[in-house]
Amino acid sequence: MSGSVKESLQLQLLEMEMLFSMFPNQGEVKLEDVNALTNIKRYLEGTREALPPNIEFVITLQIEEPKVTIDLQVTMPHNYPYVALQLFGRSPELDRQQQLLLNQALSAYLRTFDPGELCVCAAIQWLQDNSASYFLTRKLSDEPSVQAKPVKNTFLRMWIYSHHIYQQDLRKKILEVGKRLDVTGFCMTGKPGIICVEGFKNHCEEFWHTIRYPNWKHISCKHAESVETEGDGEDLRLFHSFEELLLEAHGDYGLRNDYHMNLGQFLEFLRKHKSEHVFQILFGIESKSSES
């Protein structure tokens, strides 16, 4: 492990050198600990035994249009760039909602990088290229002569069908991705496998992309429901969390991986969550009303 940490620290020093060359003026890059880089160099040279603290710093970015500043707070974990970078952008010109949306978009961009890729410089470039729209939205809301339109988001619900979902590692991945992206819904394991995911459109689409790749072939999105909302979408959710749905197998198959799920139980589950109409879409079978 020490070798990988040292390799990571060497890459961090390299990236810090690039940052200081990009921001040569005093105060543009502010280290939380002015001795941080010296301590890391001593550790790499072997004159310091204890692992030095993480590199933490703030970069003040000047955005040209509109004329505003962003303070980018960065923490480099010891194993960065092989683990995720910790960073957050702040500006007094952004309200809480716009600042949240800006950082969510920045985080989504950074997740496209492969482990081992340095990304602080790329994050800076992304902010310089993409942050203006978040400030312009705030500017419109501050102008009394113009009635600002609320920011609209698309709330999406996807119904995903798979021939089967058995493997433990796949089931674990689905749950982890669902909880990380702050979506709600369920994953019904067995044969067939059904996944419902709901939340803001960008989160659902990232979920769909992540679980499909690199090699899940027998899976498709059978149905999608979307609606524009100006709120947080909580009132549109049919589920309160993202959980694994375990129903009885149809017949006594024990632990064999060829059991069919009890679709009658699944239909009752859909009814409880106001989704009975999806049953026919998923299976081509018209559900029988419980009132008939």
From Swiss-Prot:
Q: Which Pfam families match?
A: Prp3_C, RWD
- SUPFAM superfamilies from the UniProt entry: UBC-like
For this protein, the record's CDD domains field holds: RWD_RWDD2, RWDD2_C
Q: Return the InterPro entries for the record.
A: Phi-like (IPR017359), Prp3_C (IPR010541), RWD_dom (IPR006575), UBQ-conjugating_enzyme/RWD (IPR016135)
Q: Which residues form the RWD domain?
A: 14-134
**Family annotation (PANTHER family):** RWD DOMAIN CONTAINING PROTEIN 2, RWD DOMAIN-CONTAINING PROTEIN 2A
Protein name, per record: RWD domain-containing protein 2A
Q: Which organism is it from?
A: Mus musculus
Question: Which gene carries the instructions for this protein?
Answer: Rwdd2a
